[in-house]
């Protein structure tokens, strides 16, 4: 007899896991076709449970589950390999990104493009092939766009094109206005670099402005909800001048 709500062969990453009942784990996963899902990994906390070693964040997985309630049951899991484990600053960054997804992406709301963006980000973090700040800022904006909070970065509130040599005050939920009387002070150069995804060769000043602006945008989207990982990430960013 087939199990109700049976799903197989789903690309996934673990976002978070916590104890559930006596021997199980409640695992939040980000999947490509189903978005964020909550799955019970039965027996995963038993001393010799091999499945627990697979339930690590930032490892590409293929999973299956069954059930029709808000919390389903994990039935299959295979490690897809190919990425080294994160450590140091990339690890802190990864936990920060996972917490953002947990807060902003609703369960059972598919975001295939965002999943692909996340997978690309994790690959960059794991391989250390590029600087962290530009790819993290890019993903933050991709997440905001996917969840309905995309800012307009190339035009001001009057609809005029943003000028690279001007200074703006950016108010999340509204936009950019010439001058810096209100909102987050940011240069037009930074707004255009963010809009064009062109932070790879940006100056330290532009990267700092981009970090502060994105933080303001995310704070607005989170409606004041605090992130446990942000304080540590800010310390790391300050030390690295990202």
Swiss-Prot record:
Signal sequence region: none
GO biological process: DNA recombination; double-strand break repair
Domain of life from the UniProt record: Bacteria
One GO CC term on file: bacterial nucleoid
UniProt feature coiled coil, ranges: none
Entry function: Involved in DNA repair and RecF pathway recombination.
Protein family (similarity comment): Belongs to the RecO family.
PANTHER family (UniProt xref): DNA REPAIR PROTEIN RECO (PTHR33991:SF1)
Annotated protein name in UniProt: DNA repair protein RecO
């Amino acid at each position: 007899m087939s199990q109700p709500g049976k799903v197989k062969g789903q690309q996934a990453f673990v976002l978070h896991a916590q104890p559930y009942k006596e021997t199980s784990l409640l695992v939040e996963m980000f999947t490509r076709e189903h978005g964020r899902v909550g799955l019970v990994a039965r027996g995963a906390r038993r001393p010799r449970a091999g499945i627990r070693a697979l339930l690590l964040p930032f490892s590409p997985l293929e999973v299956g589950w069954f059930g029709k309630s808000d919390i389903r049951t994990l039935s299959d899991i295979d490690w897809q390999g190919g990425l080294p484990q994160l450590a140091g600053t990339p690890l802190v960054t990864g936990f920060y990104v996972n917490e953002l997804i947990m807060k902003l992406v609703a369960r059972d709301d598919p975001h295939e493009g965002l999943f692909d963006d996340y997978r690309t980000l994790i690959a960059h973090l794991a391989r250390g092939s590029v600087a962290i700040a530009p790819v993290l800022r890019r993903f933050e904006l991709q997440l905001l766009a996917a969840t309905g909070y995309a800012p307009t970065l190339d035009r001001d509130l009057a609809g005029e094109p943003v000028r690279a040599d001007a200074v703006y005050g950016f108010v999340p939920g509204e936009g950019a206005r010439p001058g810096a009387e209100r909102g987050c002070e940011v240069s037009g150069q930074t707004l255009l670099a963010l809009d064009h995804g062109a932070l790879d060769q940006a100056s330290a000043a532009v990267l700092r402005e981009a970090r502060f602006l994105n933080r303001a945008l995310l704070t607005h989207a989170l409606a004041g909800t605090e992130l446990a990982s942000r304080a540590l990430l800010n310390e790391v960013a300050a030390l690295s001048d990202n």
